[in-house]
């Protein structure tokens, strides 16, 4: 294995050298986390979608004959995620490694790996029957609990795969909240004010408009509780916007 290829196994180096994308330290810490179970409790506009796209592409390219599945809370979010991934691929050398026609729901690479991008739906019908090595949930707290627990989680049983759950918190009676409070998951707390692209003036205006309680959920991501104390917790950095 050449040194150049070994370097590309680092997702941050891959992002910079192949995707022409330089993650901020905020995103780099998450991308380099080797944990198989990761949960990110985040405010709006903190770079969730971009980080998910980078993770999916890097995993697919560096792990032949695997399936990476991105599940979005809505069809519209799924389409936006697909556009983000296709933009990354089409603007880089990776465009030559795509086999067949690029579609919004699935992309196959020359190494036999797939990236599939689908909405959760109300009953998970479009997800059933998929076995995955990597599952990335975008706005997990908005997905039906029965879909997360009965359809998505079982996809990883046969592969002992990786699962990331990223979301703005929406309620305590959800799998996302229980996962956040589980000792088995690596945790990250991403309040919106960490994003340098979001001005303090805007946040103060939002606080006045939507009220303190909603502001704490939407921008401080406090519904899951205070930020955890584990060493993997991100407390700073400069994320890209979604």
Give short role names for the model-derived ranges:
Residues 1-242:
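Phosphate/NTP-binding elements of NTP-utilizing enzymes
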């Amino acid at each position: 294995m050449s040194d150049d290829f070994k370097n590309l196994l680092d997702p941050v180096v891959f992002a910079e050298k192949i995707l022409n994308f330089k993650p901020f330290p905020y995103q780099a810490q998450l991308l380099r986390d080797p944990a198989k179970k990761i949960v990110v409790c985040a405010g709006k506009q903190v770079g969730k979608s971009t980080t998910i796209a980078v993770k999916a592409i890097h995993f697919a390219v560096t792990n032949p004959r695997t399936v990476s599945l991105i599940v979005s809370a809505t069809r519209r979010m799924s389409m936006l995620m697909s556009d983000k991934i296709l933009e990354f691929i089409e603007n880089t050398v990776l465009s030559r490694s795509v086999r067949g026609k690029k579609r919004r729901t699935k992309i196959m690479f020359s190494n036999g790996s797939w990236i599939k991008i689908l909405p959760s739906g109300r009953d998970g019908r479009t997800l059933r029957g998929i076995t995955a090595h990597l599952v990335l949930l975008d706005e997990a707290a908005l997905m039906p609990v029965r879909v997360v627990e009965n359809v998505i989680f079982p996809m990883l049983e046969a592969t002992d795969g990786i699962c990331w759950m990223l979301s703005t918190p929406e309620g305590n009676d959800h799998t996302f909240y229980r996962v956040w409070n589980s000792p088995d998951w690596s945790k990250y707390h991403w309040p919106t004010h960490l994003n340098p692209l979001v001005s303090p003036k805007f946040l103060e205006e939002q606080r006045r408009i939507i009220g303190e309680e909603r502001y704490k959920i939407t921008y401080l991501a406090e519904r899951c509780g205070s930020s955890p104390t584990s060493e993997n917790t991100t407390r700073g950095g400069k994320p890209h916007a979604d």
